[in-house]
């Protein structure tokens, strides 16, 4: 099982999380960003949040469109949101699984 790095964005109203393949790949992407590179860095084009909306730990669920728009404004594409989280967030931890509320990551997240 491969490991992933959790990137944590401390939001004004809601904290948001994305999962990247590694810090090294994120650093490379940020030096010369492109959608092609982003797809190599982030396997799931989805945004998550803790159940209570705060912090980087605990059970994660899908971030709603409203939660994401409250943090970044309306009309942002998922690629733009993930880019902003990678740029303005911080690597929080490395994990070997993506367990979220309702099963594995990839269900019902903002995408």
UniProtKB/Swiss-Prot annotation:
Keywords for the protein's UniProt record, in alphabetical order: Cytoplasm, Nucleus, Ribosome biogenesis, rRNA processing
Location(s) in or outside the cell: Cytoplasm; Nucleus
Positions of the UniProt region annotated as Disordered: 89-111
Any one Gene Ontology BP term: rRNA processing
Classification via InterPro entries: Ribosome_mat_SBDS_N_sf (IPR036786), SDO1/SBDS_N (IPR019783)
A Gene Ontology cellular-component term: cytoplasm
Coiled-coil region(s): none
Known function: May play a role in RNA metabolism, rRNA-processing, and in a process influencing telomere capping.
Additional free-text comment from the UniProt record: Present with 2430 molecules/cell in log phase SD medium.
Protein name: Restriction of telomere capping protein 3
């Amino acid at each position: 099982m491969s490991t992933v790095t959790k990137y944590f964005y401390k939001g004004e109203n809601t904290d948001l999380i994305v999962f990247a393949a590694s810090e090294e790949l994120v650093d490379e992407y940020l030096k010369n960003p492109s959608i092609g590179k982003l797809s190599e860095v982030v396997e799931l084009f989805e945004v998550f949040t803790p159940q209570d909306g705060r912090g980087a730990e605990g059970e994660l669920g899908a971030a709603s469109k409203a939660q994401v728009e409250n943090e970044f404004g309306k009309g942002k594409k998922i690629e733009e949101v993930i880019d902003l989280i990678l740029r303005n967030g911080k690597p929080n931890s490395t994990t070997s699984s993506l367990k979220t509320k309702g099963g594995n990551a990839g269900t019902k997240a903002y995408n």
